[in-house]
A protein has these predicted regions:
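Terminal low-complexity/charged segments
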Residues: 1-165
Length: 165
């Protein structure tokens, strides 16, 4: 049986509960778009009241003017999926961690933190997962400029740009 998308009628009921949330009623596969402030409560309702017991994956998209978090949730009993999105400020992208409800989010949130610079509040171990601990940038951001590695006193340091001389 093919997985179905969460119905527009049920999405409309969620928007009644969370009036700042929206969805595209014309879309074939509508996503629930929420504020970062509402995200923890929305996620809790989706898990506890709507049966979304599995987080398939999460990722982030840099749209230059904002960072968009994208979560793919599944209700395994009803064979239903839902995409939840939240726009974050590019200058300081912050959102509550999903790990309290979905422990499997731990490593994916670390990856998004490392590569996109999103801070996940309440994350149990928020640190880099791919880049060196002292790496000064987030390489999947559209404003990324590769720092230049340099050895100083036997230690690797990162320069914001290449030295001119």
């Amino acid at each position: 049986m093919r997985t179905q998308y969460f119905s527009k009628e049920r999405l409309a009921k969620l928007v009644e509960i969370f009036p700042r949330a929206t969805f595209d009623a014309e879309a074939e596969e509508p996503a629930l778009i929420v504020t970062a402030a509402d995200f923890p409560a929305v996620l809790r309702v989706l898990k506890e009241k709507e049966g979304f017991d599995r987080l398939g994956n999460l990722t982030a998209v840099d749209w230059k003017d904002h960072i968009e978090m994208v979560y793919h949730l599944y209700n395994m009993e009803e064979n239903v999926k839902l995409e939840v999105k939240a726009a974050l400020d590019s200058a300081a992208p912050v959102i509550e961690s999903a790990t309290a409800l979905y422990p499997g989010a731990e490593f994916e949130e670390r990856e998004v933190y490392d590569l996109m610079g999103v801070e996940f509040l309440g994350h149990p171990d928020l640190r880099r997962i791919l880049m060196p601990d002292d790496y000064p940038a987030h390489p999947l951001r559209k404003d990324f400029v590769a720092p230049v590695p340099k050895m100083e006193g036997g230690k690797l340091v990162w320069l914001k740009k290449a030295p001119t001389s």
